[in-house]
Amino acid sequence: ENPNTIPKILKKINPNYVTAHFGKWHIDVDPKILGYDIHDGKNGNKNGKFVNNKTQWINEFSDNPKNIFSLSEKAMDFIENQNELEKPFYLQISHYAIHTNIVSKEKTFKKYQNKQKSLPTDNPGLAAMNEDLDEGLGMILDKIEELNISDNTYIIYTSDNGSVPTIPARRFYKNSINFPLSRGKWDAMEGGIRVPFIVSGPGIKKSSESNVPVVGYDLLPTIIDLVNPKFTPKQDVDGGSFKDILLSNGKGIVSRPYNGLIFHVPYENKIALNRAHSSIIRDNYKLIKYRDNNEINLFDLNEDIFEKTDISKLNPKISSSLETSLDNYLINVNSLKWKKGINWKNVDINIINSFY
């Protein structure tokens, strides 16, 4: 059976839903198969002007950087059309920004070029591209207000991973762009997995905040809970709903089939740690397990979000419990298991043939 996806589930709840995906797709299956009525096809980073060589780190200028504004125009047209047809809709926009190449409007770049750096890792090109993205998203929010549908629309903003740790990317460095968080994209440290997460919509108190950890795979159960709490998918769903947190001023818990957030990097990556590793976060504790020698690190994120002080030997029971939960989960889902020679290059999973 095909897997659960947000658009497919929404159509099961209400067949009138119209679903669309614009921007970066980056997986091999056709968007239509996963439930999208309208889409840009199997687009990847190259459709966002990405070139995988040294030029990706050089600042460039464009009036439509990374297709930000053309994606916004397409999104606004879609929203307006569905509103005229009185159709409920689900729209996902996966921006090419702020992935390299580093492209922004020249005017925006000059604004940040002339600002004094507060950290050595500050980058005017990334800052400018991020502001251009913010402007593009603002166009869509303005359209929602113009159509008077904000009281019936949930908007979710997040990212898939933290920033590259350095520009250009390299393995060794003192502080990453994500400083004071440790490391960045490609690694399961906080700089790689802790990302912005903003939700607005009916019932959510303006400017409220929450310290409850959530993760991308919580989105599907949360959306189900918002649209029709009585609906139960036929297949198991990994995450849990954070609806109560949204509607309770950031307070509450997320109930998942297993206890903790799990991240798995089953390969070596020469421009990252170059060590296969996994991590689990439960309450305020985070355990990282390295797969080459089974080394364990434990951090209290409430006291040490920078992941500088390993407290595993001071807390052997907590370390053992988290390690057992982590390994049991990977076994239960038959996850890819690192073995010597598995790196981050695209290799057919049947060739790797190494699983828990």
Give, region by region, the residue ranges found by the protein language model:
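Formylglycine-dependent sulfatase
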Residues: E1-R291, E295-I296, I305-I331, W338-Y356
